């Protein structure tokens, strides 16, 4: 049998200012902290941009070399594919320093001009290629919440109040 708890721990109480002046001071402090966080984020983004710019120039020629070498390797492998794949029996060849492989991608569909394609499919009687999505109309439920009151899985929430703190900020007009 489990022992009953000797001591019940409760969460520490959150900080609550005790008067109007403390609230005013705390709102000012929130604004100060938000501005400081914004300054630090800007400084961080500036540093990231500097690092990116510094390394981008060094990375670009390396990427070009990789692309050139890759095209050359692919060209040689295509010319010698029959030998590398044992007459098409395997799809991968081990070349000591790495593997080369050939894979056929699965079929895919791309559609340009969705509305025009839909109209054409309907006109040609090819509705089987058109998917109709059913979904619950939440806007209608909000207009008639009593009609769905007994339906399991539907909860209409109303009267929820959000509290927000908006410290005053002065715009520089820049």
Swiss-Prot record:
Induction: Expressed in the early phase of the viral replicative cycle. Expression of early genes is repressed by viral Repc (latency) and favored by viral Ner protein. It comes from the Viruses. Residues 26-56 form a coiled coil. GO terms for molecular function: double-stranded DNA binding. It is found in: Host cytoplasm. Homodimer. GO terms for biological process: DNA protection; symbiont-mediated evasion of DNA end degradation by host; symbiont-mediated suppression of host innate immune response. Keywords: Coiled coil, DNA end degradation evasion by virus, DNA-binding, Early protein, Host cytoplasm, Host-virus interaction, Inhibition of host innate immune response by virus, Viral immunoevasion. Pfam families: Phage_Mu_Gam. This is Putative DNA ends protecting protein gam. Protects linear double-stranded DNA from host exonuclease degradation. Binds to linear dsDNA irrespective of the precise architecture of the DNA terminus but not to RNA or to ssDNA. The keyword DNA-binding applies. One of its GO terms (cellular component) is host cell cytoplasm.
